[in-house]
A protein has these predicted regions:
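N-terminal non-catalytic structural scaffold regions of very large proteins
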Residues: 1-195
């Protein structure tokens, strides 16, 4: 996995996500039962909306359900004063968490970086009195969720675990020690004699 190599190089999962993805913050508005976020035209390149988008300040619908919007339309809305928008929870479905969200003290009570949002996940987060989510910005043009799903599925969490995993692939059957695994890893990628 690509994330295993980056972990072995000393990055943690949060640093990897921050390096490759920008984030967007959504806050639950209990009065409207919608999610509020800043309107950034950069995030709206050739996008079809399955749900309506509401101006948080005026309460007016600014993007209708089924409407297609591109960067120029989005820029025009921003120039007309659109700053914050309200969206339904359904518009968050299929988006990915930018950081871990802890909903209780148990190990299983954490939604990890890269978790895809759906009705159940959002409801469990709201039931835990968490009203703000950081979502990684992805799109179908040039920023797919591939690394996010890789990070979510990577069982390694530390540099040592990742180096040991790489060692097991390079030398299957040999019992790894972290010292030997680190030496092999460093010789493989950082040896001046080799490169």
């Amino acid at each position: 996995l690509a994330s295993t190599l980056l972990l072995a190089l000393g990055y943690n999962k949060s640093e990897i996500v921050n390096e490759f993805y920008e984030k967007e913050q959504f806050t639950f508005d209990q009065k409207t039962e919608k999610w509020k976020t800043k309107f950034n035209p950069e995030n709206y390149k050739a996008k079809n909306f399955s749900e309506e988008v509401i101006d948080a300040k005026t309460g007016k619908v600014v993007i209708k359900r089924g409407e297609k919007i591109n960067f120029l339309n989005a820029k025009k809305l921003a120039n007309e004063g659109l700053k914050d928008i309200l969206v339904s929870k359904e518009s968050l479905f299929g988006k990915f968490l930018h950081k871990d969200v802890k909903i209780n003290d148990e190990e299983s009570g954490i939604f990890k970086i890269g978790t895809e949002l759906n009705d159940t996940v959002i409801q469990q987060i709201l039931d835990s009195d968490i009203n703000t989510l950081e979502i990684s910005i992805t799109n179908s043009i040039n920023k797919g969720p591939y690394l996010l799903t890789t990070i979510l599925n990577d069982k390694n969490n530390t540099k040592d675990e990742a180096i040991t995993e790489i060692y097991k692939m390079l030398r299957p059957g040999e019992p790894p020690t972290i010292e030997i695994a680190t030496q092999i890893f460093n010789n493989l990628f950082f040896s001046s004699d080799r490169y």
